[in-house]
Amino acid sequence: MSQPPPASNLQKLRAALLSYPAALSALWAIPDRTAFADKVAEMGRGAGVDMAVADILAAMTPRGPKTPAMPVKGAGLSPSWMPSWLSITGQGARLDWVYAGGEAFTAPFADQDFARLATHPLNQLLPAISDPGELGSLPGPERPIDGMIFHISRCGSTLASRMLAQVPDILVLSEPQAIAAVLSAHTLIRIDPRVQQAWLNGVLGAYVRAAGTRRLVIKLDVDSLFDHARLRQASPQTPFAVLHRDPLEILVAQTGGSEPKPGLPPPEEVARWLAALCVTGARAVAAGARPVGYEDLAETVLDPDRPFLNLQIGPAYRARMAAVASLDAKSPNKRFTPDSLARQAAADERLKMLARQVIGPAWEPLAGLR
């Protein structure tokens, strides 16, 4: 087996490739590892770096936290690079970048798409990471993000994002980890709120640039609802939606119903968390977000008369979206099976009381019931 080439040669080759976006674009079209290495060797010779194909192949390693990283300056990366993972630990912090090449994100969650992209030879040869502190120096969104989706958990947000992903000119990022990590950074390190906001602006700006001419929709993870004001500050003209559902059905899904699984929080704790989400969701609606109930979700996303997130979508793509609505959002190879009645039936009196007394008073204003 070939040993990795001398670091100096590898560093020179990587630097040469990074400085030439057209080269990266050409390499992205070559998924075969050997053909990719052949082309890299040819490009290297043109840049004055002579490396054997075997050495290039040896330098292409699977991406992961233990992968020998390639430190870069985030500001020097082309728009095709996207923040894929932000890690903050007691040992330090790193922001991983993945070259996306303008590809669509079609998996239920962005992390799955980033993992797929990371297997491309280009991302294995160029395992780019940067100091998260540099996010503050990156430009924020240069245009408004086209839509953001918040939710109070288990209420169809993945379905909404999967439906929108059927439209070629819409890039949908479903719960990108880097955004959630920035929003929770203050729980792990001491960080000035203004710096944290600058980090958020930098991540969002990178995603907007990666979208290019496509419209960008971001579906946030559930706890990001608590930070809706920060996200609105980063892109104040963005249409927002808050998805919700009957609190008993969510509570059953989050607790396991009358037969809870070991390791889950007590139902009372889950109920208080859901109530807090509903209160925050109602505040987001008061600030201009659109509330959407689970039972109306598919019809709302497909409605041409009052477009969801103000997104204009033609009838042909609406037909594709409708077809996706008949599938399980998180397991697209399966047909969707309605589960509302089953969840209601799985609730014991304890859960019914919590849904009625703890969550209900917070959910009803969000749902427009009072």
Kindly label every feature range from the protein language model.
Residues M1-G76:
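Terminal, compositionally biased segments used for targeting/anchoring and flexible tails
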Residues A26, R215-K219, R290-G293:
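Short catalytic-loop micro-motif centered on adjacent basic/acidic residues
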Residues P65-P139, C278-P291, E295-R370:
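PAPS-dependent sulfotransferases, especially Golgi type II membrane carbohydrate sulfotransferases
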Residues P83-S87, G92-R94, A100-G101, F105-A298, L302-A316:
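PAPS-dependent sulfotransferase catalytic domain
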Residues D146, R215-L216, G263-E268, A323:
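Surface-exposed cleft-lining segments at the edges of enzyme active sites
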Residues Q3-P6, R33, P193-Q197, L274:
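Generic alpha-helical segment signature
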Residues I191-G202, E259-P266, R335-A345:
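A polyampholytic, Gly/Pro-enriched intrinsically disordered region
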